[in-house]
Amino acid sequence: MEVDYFSYVVLTRALLPHFIARKAGHFVITSSVMGKIGTPMRSAYAAAKHALHGFFDCLRAEVAADNIKVTILTPGYIRTNISLYALTNNAYGLGKPSENIENGLPTDRAAKQILKAIKKGSFEPYIGRFSGERIALWLTRLAPGVFTRIAPKLIPK
């Protein structure tokens, strides 16, 4: 929560008075698909990302009259080396690439999607490939009970 949520809140509170004084600004927040859905083994991370969505959805409405925009990037799997260093429940790095991340969107394509979304002023763009995570986002919006029944089956054996 300290990094994935509170750091955004502290920085936003520092910048907001300047944006309001200028009557312009654009907050671009990097969240995650986990900010919209919950999957097994990711409860703390998902909680922080859900908190980001709630905070910045509210802020968007509060500052719209001051010409301040809020974009919440919602990336899926992006091909990076993050899983090599991601902490496991025993505080050691995973030390190996995640198959999902290895098959994720290359970083250069992710950057292009991000820049396009910022230029368009998108509220909450999905960044990534058309894949299971995008389908999960649709399911949680259109038929939340379906994903709730599928989620327990995602626990690694």
Predicted regions and their residues:
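Active-site loop immediately N-terminal to the catalytic Tyr-X3-Lys motif
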Residues: 37-44, 59
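A transmembrane-helix-recognition feature enriched in membrane-embedded lipid enzymes
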Residues: 122-157
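Residue(s) in the substrate-gating loop at a strand-loop-helix junction
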Residues: 32
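SDR active-site lid
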Residues: 65-131
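Alpha-helical segment proximal to the catalytic Tyr-Lys
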Residues: 17, 61-64
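Active-site helix of classical SDR
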Residues: 12, 48
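A short helix-coil junction within the Rossmann-fold of NAD(P)-dependent oxidoreductases
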Residues: 14-23
